[in-house]
A protein has these predicted regions:
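N-terminal catalytic or cofactor-binding beta/alpha core of small enzyme domains
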Residues: 9-183, 194-195, 201-205, 212-234, ...
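Hydrophobic "anchor" residues on beta-strands that sit immediately upstream
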Residues: 186
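Short glycine/threonine-rich loop-to-helix capping motif typified by GTGT followed
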Residues: 233-242
Length: 307
């Protein structure tokens, strides 16, 4: 077993071994303790993810360990007294539901490509999970825990560096979508939106720095749920970049026909930190959906505001 994953009291942990790996997996059973572990995940099937991972290794001097995962090397680095592991998987990144059975990290950051028909160069962050059916990984009507502060930190770093380096990229939140649906804080840091951008080493470096920024604390953040508007919500993005607001889950207009009070409750409860408010993109919500949203938020005691 790798010493780097051990805690002081071995009796408080259970170690499992996943098929095709020799990396010990820790589940901490000691009441009130959480392993200080951050995971960065990239898929060998993902050009952008591998590009971002290379930038992490090159710019942050990640150490190659003797461990392996999915028959791939494992890298490690300590940030702010938090052990950070960089792992490579051989499946598509949305098909990683199995990770929830293996790890219990403080934060899991997926390094990923972003694809869109528009092809607009984009740097983005979002929480994975399914607001309705599970078309692309994960489980139906089940969202991951949203690390709102971590995503805000990553978004801020993306915006700062792309301006400093003169990169012609949009920076944006995306709504909560696709798998996996994990019971740990999880986020995607993405580079897109076409193969040209996936291979852009300068943009990949920005995403790598953003992933590291996600590890930082954000004690002054005001955590919010976003509802309404498009898949890429410029209003929510601007609020996060110019105020203390940090968005966790974002429910877009197109998902609202399938969203009910239970999903809204889940999005509030499955967010790191207390959700102080729900920000409603009022013009981006059909009139027929507004009453159920307001009623659900009132029942939860969550203040709402319109933008």
């Amino acid at each position: 077993m790798a010493p780097s994953l051990l805690t002081e009291d071995l009796l408080s942990n259970t170690f499992l071994f996943h098929e095709n790996l020799n990396l010990p997996i820790m589940h901490n059973k000691r009441s009130g303790t959480t392993p200080k572990l951050i995971l960065f995940i990239a898929s060998t099937k993902d050009t952008a993810g591998m590009n971002i991972a290379k930038q992490l290794i090159d710019h942050y001097n990640f150490e190659k360990l003797s461990e392996s995962f999915h028959k791939n090397p494992v890298y490690s680095k300590t940030f702010q007294n938090k052990e950070t592991k960089l792992l490579f998987i051989n499946t598509e990144i949305v098909d990683t539901q199995f990770l929830g059975d293996l790890f219990n990290p403080n934060l899991l950051v997926f390094l990923s490509r972003h694809s869109s028909a528009s092809g607009i160069p984009t740097l983005s962050v979002h929480t994975p999970g399914n607001l309705s059916e599970a078309k692309f990984g994960g489980t139906p009507r089940n969202v991951s825990i949203s690390p709102a502060a971590a995503m805000k930190n990553a978004l801020l770093e993306m915006a700062k560096l792309k301006d400093e380096r003169g990169l012609d990229y949009e920076v944006s939140y995306e709504c909560t979508h696709h798998g996996p649906s994990l019971n740990v804080p999880a986020m995607f840091a993405e580079l897109g939106s076409s193969p040209k951008q996936w291979k852009d080493s300068k943009a990949a470096e920005v995403v790598a720095h953003a992933a590291v920024a996600a590890v930082s604390e954000c004690s002054n953040c005001s955590v919010a749920l976003g509802i309404g508007g498009p898949h890429y919500n410029k209003k929510f993005t601007k609020l996060a970049l110019t105020t203390q607001r940090a968005f966790g889950h974002i429910i877009p207009k197109y998902a609202l026909p399938q969203v009910d009070a239970d999903i809204i409750k889940q999005c509030v409860e499955r967010t790191v930190g207390t959700v102080d408010s729900a920000v409603l993109d009022w013009k981006g919500i059909k009139g027929e959906h507004k009453p159920k949203i307001i009623a659900a938020l009132e029942k939860l005691g969550v203040h709402s505001e319109r933008v």
